[in-house]
């Protein structure tokens, strides 16, 4: 019997369509061979790790729980250990009577969010034991506390000195008002919910070491969240990390002033995904009255890099009193930008006083160079960070960085060597320093108008006349910048720059924050 032509054509079509089906679909009903999983670039979580001079277990006795540990924070922990050791001998903000007793003084330390207890173990094993009277470590999680107790045995810790608690962090600190000399707080996200209790549990002159990892909020991605958390409005700019530090310090300072206390920043740095602040907190009602001079607002151009920064208040001399606070009226002379004629927007308030203490950084560098601290894994990187910050202190009165690439884009110019750019700034009598954390950012005492003139001068010298306004829309802000007269004559001579590894690469892919620790319920 002959096959029906229509049926024959249909079979051919089905065969053709079947050949087009991907192999994965064909084998759905079969039992496919299990694929080999690609090896991960980051090691699986170990049960035990050694960091500094401490060895800790990350799991409890029955291995049903793994405590939170992030290797990316080892830089943070290394710097904190040597900072606390430096604080033991730092006498700058002490009264003469306290300076005499500093050599014999013993210090108490609290770490309210401990997880593994690693920081506490490192303080016990790496800091001079004769300088420590008490180390308090705490975690809410019962199984985390179980891990901490395992680690106490592992590191042969004297339990008379190191005390373990299982409490809510703020509750523990409120129970111990004015008890601690050093408060080390490293939370997931913002430290702001813990600030009030940290301030109150610290003694007069105590050292606070705080970490903030909520960078999207502090850097301007969610300004409405920044406002209700920190009381400040950010602006999304290339120098957002410095803005983040200044927003956090403003919020901390305004909180401390409720208790007639002021902050003295020692070191503020950012690395990878977080900012870390070290500051001393002191009782001083008179200094609290000077806080308005340390807070300020910024008007930033919506298009170019021009900005105006004004403090909340100014000193006004008075014969009857030492000084009177005269509040600024928060107005600016020109509503529009003097560089490109665009509108300016207001943001802040920020901390506009010092981010660092030069004496502290020099003492920290001195300690770091000693052989007793050579074992620190991040010794050389800490040294580079501190030297970079020390270099920036040449222009410590200049608030916020500039973005070198943005200046080039604003005048439709290809980026040229930063060494040549620095030479041009220096030739006009101004200073410039490169940021310690981003090679594209810099600080200078040259006003934005002068920087744009340098860019335009370079373009005129190195481009043809017809290319000066090429691809520039007459209605754009770039056109307004380029059409302004050049008032300076810079010399483009390259400056020899220091060659060292200031900007190291991450050691592994996905090097950064870990997921938020989840609450583990007992079955």
Language-model features and meaning:
Residues 1-523:
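SAM-dependent transferase fold signal centered on methyltransferase-like domains
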């Amino acid at each position: 019997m002959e096959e029906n032509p229509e049926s024959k054509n249909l079979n051919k079509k089905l065969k053709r369509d079947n050949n087009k089906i991907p192999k994965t679909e064909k084998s759905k009903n079969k039992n496919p061979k299990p694929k080999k999983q690609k090896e991960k670039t980051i090691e699986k979580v170990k049960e035990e790790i050694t960091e500094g001079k401490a060895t800790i277990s990350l799991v409890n006795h029955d291995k049903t729980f793994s405590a939170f540990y992030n290797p990316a924070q080892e830089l943070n922990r290394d710097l904190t250990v040597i900072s606390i050791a430096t604080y033991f001998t730092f006498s700058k903000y002490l009264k003469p009577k306290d300076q005499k007793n500093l050599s014999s003084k013993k210090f108490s330390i609290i770490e309210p969010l401990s997880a593994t207890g690693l920081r506490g173990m490192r303080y016990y094993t790496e800091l001079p034991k004769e300088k420590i009277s008490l180390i308090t470590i705490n975690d809410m999680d019962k199984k985390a506390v179980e891990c901490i107790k395992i680690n106490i045995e592992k590191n042969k810790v004297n339990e008379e000195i190191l005390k373990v608690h299982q409490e809510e962090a703020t509750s523990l600190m409120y129970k111990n008002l004015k008890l601690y000399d050093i408060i080390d707080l490293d939370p997931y996200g913002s430290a702001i919910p813990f600030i009030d209790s940290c301030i109150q549990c610290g003694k007069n002159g105590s050292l606070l070491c705080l970490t903030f990892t909520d960078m999207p909020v502090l850097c301007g991605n969610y300004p409405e969240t920044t406002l209700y958390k920190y009381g400040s409005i950010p602006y999304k700019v290339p120098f957002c990390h410095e803005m983040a530090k200044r927003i956090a310090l403003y919020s901390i300072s305004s909180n401390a002033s409720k208790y007639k206390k002021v902050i003295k920043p020692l070191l503020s740095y950012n690395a990878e995904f977080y900012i870390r602040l070290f500051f001393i907190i002191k009782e001083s009602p008179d200094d609290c009255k000077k806080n308005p001079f340390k807070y300020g607002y910024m008007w930033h151009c919506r298009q170019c890099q021009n900005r105006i920064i004004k403090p909340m208040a100014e000193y006004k001399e008075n014969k009857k009193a030492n000084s009177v606070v005269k509040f600024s009226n928060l107005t600016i002379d020109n509503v529009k930008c003097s560089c490109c004629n665009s509108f300016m927007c207001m943001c802040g308030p920020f901390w506009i006083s010092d981010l660092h203490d030069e004496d502290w950084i020099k003492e920290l560098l001195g300690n770091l160079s000693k052989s007793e601290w050579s074992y620190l894994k991040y010794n050389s990187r800490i040294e580079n960070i501190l030297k970079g910050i020390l270099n920036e202190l040449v222009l410590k009165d200049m608030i916020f960085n500039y973005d070198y690439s943005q200046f080039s884009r604003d005048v439709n110019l290809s980026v040229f060597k930063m060494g040549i750019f620095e030479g041009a700034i220096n030739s006009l009598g101004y200073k410039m320093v490169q940021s310690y954390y981003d090679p594209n950012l810099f600080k200078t005492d040259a006003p934005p108008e002068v920087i744009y003139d340098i860019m335009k001068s370079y373009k005129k010298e190195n481009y043809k006349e017809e290319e000066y306004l090429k691809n520039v829309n007459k209605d754009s802000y770039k056109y307004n910048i380029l059409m302004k007269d050049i008032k300076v004559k810079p010399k483009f001579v390259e400056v020899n720059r220091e060659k060292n590894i200031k900007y190291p690469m991450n050691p592994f892919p996905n090097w950064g924050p870990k997921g938020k620790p989840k609450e583990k319920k007992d079955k």
